[in-house]
């Protein structure tokens, strides 16, 4: 049986399948995804195979979108449990608004020509991400993806720059 490997230059993708498929992350046990279900995945350093990409929509979500989204939620993130590295970085649930998802996925793959287009894409992707808010592990996974992107040394450099500005 043939399967497709999904590649993204962004840290996060959300898939929406219009028919039943399975997804395998890093060669582990395949996870079945029913029609009209969404899967949120961390792509960075992970090998993601899906049984079929026909009738599958993919939204690509950048570091900046994740960062802006966490800021937008305005939650105390210090209380969020740390994502377990050994866990498969995937969350799945039914999609309630496939039409919105379709537009979000299209926008996420097109370079934004204007500022308003950029804002529209951001709002659409926030809507897609917000569907996962009820999932207990969602914020842990988002923060894990963000931490993965910004290495500690970068954080320290940013912090020391801030101190320089103030002193």
Regions inferred by a protein language model and the residue ranges of each:
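Alpha-helix boundary/capping residues
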Residues: 73, 107-108, 161
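N-terminal regulatory/effector-sensing and dimerization cores
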Residues: 1-86
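Short amphipathic alpha-helical segments and their helix-coil junctions
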Residues: 101-113
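Aromatic/histidine-rich interaction motifs
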Residues: 75-103
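Solvent-exposed, well-ordered amphipathic alpha-helical segments
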Residues: 19-24, 34-35, 53-57, 62, ...
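Short, Lys/Arg-enriched, Trp-marked, Pro/Gly-tolerant hinge/linker segments that flank
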Residues: 85-95, 111-167
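Long, highly charged amphipathic alpha-helices
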Residues: 64-68, 102-103, 127, 153
